[in-house]
């Protein structure tokens, strides 16, 4: 499985590390991904998702059904 948020689709960003002498080298800024068990009331069960921490905060505000609908994800397959 790739390091990608299952709800928002966030993935790593290519960036530059700049030293004090201003030498630039490529670096990868990874997304802060966490495995999260989320209660899905419509399915009456837990769903295990790999989410970014930003998506976890949004999930607590909006709910799993609304976020899955926006992302076009079928929770029955998870």
From Swiss-Prot:
Superkingdom assignment: Bacteria
Underlying gene: rpmB
Cellular component terms per the entry's GO annotation: ribonucleoprotein complex; ribosome
Cross-referenced Gene3D superfamilies: Ribosomal protein L28/L24
Xref: HAMAP family: Ribosomal_bL28 (MF_00373)
SUPFAM superfamilies to which the protein is assigned, alphabetical: L28p-like
Xref: Pfam families: Ribosomal_L28
Database matches in InterPro entries: Ribosomal_bL28 (IPR026569), Ribosomal_bL28/bL31-like_sf (IPR034704), Ribosomal_bL28_bact-type (IPR001383), Ribosomal_bL28_sf (IPR037147)
Disordered: region residues: 1-23
Gene Ontology terms for molecular function: structural constituent of ribosome
Keywords: Ribonucleoprotein, Ribosomal protein
Family recorded in the similarity comment: Belongs to the bacterial ribosomal protein bL28 family.
Protein's UniProt name: Large ribosomal subunit protein bL28
Protein's GO biological process: translation
């Amino acid at each position: 499985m790739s390091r990608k948020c299952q709800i928002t689709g966030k993935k790593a960003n290519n960036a530059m590390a700049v030293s004090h002498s201003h030498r630039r080298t490529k670096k990868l800024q990874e997304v802060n991904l966490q495995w999260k068990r989320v209660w899905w009331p419509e399915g009456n069960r837990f769903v295990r998702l790999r989410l970014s921490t930003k998506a976890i905060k949004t999930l607590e505000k909006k709910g799993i059904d609304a976020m899955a609908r926006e992302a076009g994800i079928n929770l029955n397959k998870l």
